[in-house]
Amino acid sequence: MKLFGSSGIRGIVNKEVTPELALQVGLVLGSRKKTAVIGRDPRVSAPMIEHALVAGLTAAGCDVTKVGMVTTPTLAYAAREYECGVMVTASHNPSEYVGIKLWNPDGMAFDSAQQEEIEDAIENENFLRVTWDLIGKVAENGNAIRDHMDLIEGLVRDSKLRVVLDCGCGAGSTITPYLLQELGCQVITLNSQPDGHFPARNPEPNDQNLSLLKKAVVAFEADFGIAHDGDADRMMAVDEKGNFVSGDELLAIFGRFECGDEKGTVVVPVDTSMMVDDYLEGSEIIRTRVGDVYVAEGIKQYGAIYGGEPSGSWIFPKISYCPDGIYAAAKLVEIVREKKLSELRAELPVYATKRGAFPCANEKKAELMEKVKTKLEPLGKVLDIDGIRVELENGWVLVRPSGTEAKVRITAEAREKVDEIYEMAEKIVKEALK
């Protein structure tokens, strides 16, 4: 039984992720943990899944503390006082999706071994149902957001920048506007009222979805703009000229400021630009599978200073192994206080990148990748820890099945003629899909 993808359990509500499944996850988790903290993002289905999880946890004898609607990094930080954390979220996915993500007390998402243990236990119904006098207690804690803010404010310097913030009607609305104000910023908010229908824009904070933010940054003459996804584990940015800052650019900028003159180790996924390697020359760059849990595992394994994903997940191990879009927003304020974001971008090497995605049923992904590997292997050095990445003379290409959606993704990067590399991979994928 395979339930976990690259970002926990996730799927369409009442089809792939149901109250029955949530109940089973709760029973298995509650059979192995004595205490748990649970939170949720604003999506419409989140309370239903949360109730089912709480029922399962308490039925197995686990005491549960509910922190309400919070961001994923807030929940992961709250988990430090419990044996585990449970977050109901589908992150950047649309309204019809819901998911469950599990956290260890150090802010690390459940690793592969822990995920497999839960999958096996559900399949074999290996869980407890305690007697009435041992049922777990349910409590509420309203301090999780304040605690997270206090942590960040103790690490980041104040600034008087003007910032436009687009929370995308997600959970970031509960914390980021207030945090930046307390750090001295003048904050202009967009879509900062939680709404699980995500009426303003798609929750994913990519270039295509942030047209309003880009216009607002210019109109209000702001120093830069910030955007979150549905649960604010992600953070993306727009410079003062209204230009979207790519994930690879932010990854490199954060890496430079975290490493400083000491260099160090930085962990990134296989789909990361070679720009990061060149800009962080002298630092060791470790590549992992795509997914924040794998990046976090790499950070822990190699004792890295920092790690992140171009999708907008930034992990700062000095505070947590959870991607923290809230801390990243505050950290970027501190960085831009010293130099404009457009000037920082101008320092970066520029390579052409092209990305695309094609529908592919989950059950057909393995067969597809075998066909793709056969075609790509003769072309160059292969890294196959997650999909197939081939190093070419002029760049590289990665073909990788999505861990959260029924898609296969292509990423190509080159010093020149990126279209040729992309189209070559596209042709191979399309033929394999027939």
From Swiss-Prot:
Cofactor binding, note field: Binds 1 Mg(2+) ion per subunit.
Annotated GO MF terms: magnesium ion binding; phosphoglucosamine mutase activity; phosphomannomutase activity
Tree of life domain: Archaea
UniProt entry keywords in alphabetical sequence: Isomerase, Magnesium, Metal-binding, Phosphoprotein
Modification type Phosphoserine: residues: S91
Gene3D superfamilies, alphabetized: Alpha-D-Glucose-1,6-Bisphosphate, subunit A, domain 3, Alpha-D-phosphohexomutase, C-terminal domain
One Pfam family named in its UniProt record: PGM_PMM_I
Cofactor: Mg(2+)
Binding of Mg(2+), residues: S91, D229, D231, D233
Catalytic activity annotation: alpha-D-glucosamine 1-phosphate = D-glucosamine 6-phosphate
CDD domains given in the database record: PGM_like1 (cd03087)
Record GO biological process: carbohydrate metabolic process
Entry annotation: catalytic residues: S91 (phosphoserine intermediate)
First-tier enzyme category under EC: isomerase
Entry comment on modification after translation: Activated by phosphorylation.
Classification via InterPro entries: A-D-PHexomutase_a/b/a-I, A-D-PHexomutase_a/b/a-I/II/III, A-D-PHexomutase_a/b/a-II, A-D-PHexomutase_a/b/a-III, A-D-PHexomutase_C, A-D-PHexomutase_C_sf, A-D-PHexomutase_CS, Alpha-D-phosphohexomutase_SF
EC numbers on record: 5.4.2.10
Function: Catalyzes the conversion of glucosamine-6-phosphate to glucosamine-1-phosphate.
Entry's family note: Belongs to the phosphohexose mutase family.
PANTHER family documented for this protein: PHOSPHOMANNOMUTASE
Protein name as it appears in the record: Probable phosphoglucosamine mutase
Species name: Methanosarcina acetivorans (strain ATCC 35395 / DSM 2834 / JCM 12185 / C2A)
Top-level taxonomy: Archaea, Methanobacteriati, Methanobacteriota, Stenosarchaea group, Methanomicrobia
